[in-house]
Amino acid sequence: MGSSEQELVAIARDLGCGSYFLGTFDKRFPGFMAPNKLACAIVNTAGRETGGVHWLALAWNPKSHTCYLFDPFGFSDERLKQIYQFEYEGLLKRSALASTPDHCITLVKSTQTVQGPFSAACGLFCCMFLHAFIHWPSNPMEQNPTMDLLTGVPNSMLQSPQVEPTLRRNQERLYRFLTQHSPYFRRHRERIEKATAFDQMKNAQVLFHNKIFY
């Protein structure tokens, strides 16, 4: 279920991330080691030995000394720690970003939900965000042609039936976007869509979803 590392790397390459894309990592991501270079990565909240749990995207814009953290669920810092035991403060501290002249980093984090609670498409949404970052590094979260295809809802409404049509439409637009921009996705579309379906996690006994709801 969900996206494999190989799939995400192939799709990110198709989307033009090129040498700026550092790859996929587990929760031990060492951080951005070149403070003067535009860079991005897809990071899992769990260790690789677990098979993975949830994908996030991280990006660094050296021009503005800004680090972007994109979570398709838009969880708060506290919820990320509670649900996934994932903390990004340590990640930033152990990276080379602290070596910037003024030791000052701006963190911009997504706060709205674009992915349905039972969807397994978190990695694909991360790829979409990285496309926005590479093309519009000063405003990758919003107000660009890529991310404006999606409609965010308050994270507090993640489980609300009221927003299900919006989140389902987001996933349909995600698939359409990847079909247009990624030859790899087009070749493997049926398999990828099945593995990342909007209701993929609904009947699965997956720990992190239990934590989300309970």
Swiss-Prot record:
Requires DNA and protease cofactor for maximal activation. Inside nascent virions, becomes partially activated by binding to the viral DNA, allowing it to cleave the cofactor that binds to the protease and fully activates it. Actin, like the viral protease cofactor, seems to act as a cofactor in the cleavage of cytokeratin 18 and of actin itself. Gene3D superfamilies: Adenoviral Proteinase, Chain A. Cleaves viral precursor proteins (pTP, pIIIa, pVI, pVII, pVIII, and pX) inside newly assembled particles giving rise to mature virions. Protease complexed to its cofactor slides along the viral DNA to specifically locate and cleave the viral precursors. Mature virions have a weakened organization compared to the unmature virions, thereby facilitating subsequent uncoating. Without maturation, the particle lacks infectivity and is unable to uncoat. Late in adenovirus infection, in the cytoplasm, may participate in the cytoskeleton destruction. Cleaves host cell cytoskeletal keratins K7 and K18. It comes from Human adenovirus F serotype 41 (HAdV-41). Induction: Expressed in the late phase of the viral replicative cycle. GO terms for biological process: proteolysis. The record marks 51-52 as: Cleavage. This is Protease. InterPro entries: Papain-like_cys_pep_sf, Peptidase_C5. Coiled coil: none annotated. The gene is L3. It is found in: Virion; Host nucleus. HAMAP family: ADV_PRO (MF_04059). GO terms for cellular component: host cell nucleus; virion component. Its EC number is 3.4.22.39. It catalyses: Cleaves proteins of the adenovirus and its host cell at two consensus sites: -Yaa-Xaa-Gly-Gly-|-Xaa- and -Yaa-Xaa-Gly-Xaa-|-Gly- (in which Yaa is Met, Ile or Leu, and Xaa is any amino acid). GO terms for molecular function: cysteine-type endopeptidase activity; DNA binding.
